[in-house]
């Protein structure tokens, strides 16, 4: 994904579209591309989090709009928490982690020490955080 400027209807919805690799020269489009690449890598490198045997919970309904939205995935050895703020203002949201200990901000690589399973997390407006119990390996 690079923020395409060509309509989905050009050459039909599923028709071939011109490739615009020059988009990667724009820092915002490069950042968007890199974010999608890391999300795909997360999915491909950690299949055990995305199987029918993993534990999955989500709080993403309309009633969760003001309290933040959360998705939690757990396997026997790994945990992932996605926390999103889809409002117009920055927020501090109560987050419940499945385990305490060392976590990682998957998109920045920063370590996060989780001492209490329930704690507040700052999330800017229109943003999200992905926290994992394993580091992102480039």
Per-segment meaning from a language model:
Residues 115-138:
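C-terminal beta-strand-rich structural cap/linker in extracellular carbohydrate-active enzymes
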Residues 2-80, 86:
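Glycan-recognition and catalytic regions of carbohydrate-active enzymes
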Residues 4-7, 91, 111:
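Conserved protein kinase catalytic core
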Residues 105-118:
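Solvent-exposed beta-strand/loop surfaces of large extracellular or lumenal domains
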Residues 1-4, 86-89, 128, 136:
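Short, glycine-/Ser/Thr-/acidic-enriched flexible segments
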Residues 86-101:
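Surface-exposed beta-strand/loop patches in extracellular or lumenal glycoproteins
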Residues 81-83, 130-131:
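Short hydrophobic-aromatic micro-motifs
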